[in-house]
Amino acid sequence: MSDNEVAHRALDGKRYLLSGPFDLTTPATSVVELAVSGRRCEITAGGPRLGDDVLAALGATGYDEELVYAGGRLAIARTEPYDPQIRLRENRLTGVWLGKRFSFFTHLYGATSNDLLSVLSGFAIREHDDGIAITPHRPHGFAGTATLVKEVPGLGLLEISPLTPQHTAQLPRWRGMTTQAGELFVDELSDGSPYFVLAGSDTWTTVLPLRDTELAEVPRLVGELRLRTAV
């Protein structure tokens, strides 16, 4: 297979370029946590059907409200899922912003539509050809780094984020396998399942093997992956 290339934008505005002899047509999602208006909320962005898919998974049949907002459409749905651990029904509000090519959603609990609008007013929304970027207004801000999640058939699920000093401190003292995308290390999840960590010059990528992943082939496949940030 000849090399393919794709660009994806994380919610913090960072762009990642992936290339190699892989099927890179699968969509990517991005996740980031924000501290806005006294609340911590998680924003998840993806393709135009992401919000609809989330609502279907929650058992909702449609939206309760729809508004024009920030150059797109804001759809609001309310559900009351039952949590068996605490034996209570939760009052959950789901807000979905739909742009021309991308969308994002967030969940708020015990909240009203005005609460959602207050949260959304804490950051600017900008839709690009390769994804959505949000910029918090002061004094609001990101509560963590944004992660880009993309499935690459044959390789696994990639979770990509900027390399931080905290990441560097987690690396073992020995050197990993050198690849064109960075140093590759292998570790185990709590259930004993293997996963891989790829430490690039400015990226940190977790590679989670999927059902079609041949573990013995992962080092070779990662060696054919090129991953970098771009302006």
Where are these regions (language model features)?
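Intrinsically disordered, low-complexity prosegments and terminal tails associated
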Residues: 1-231
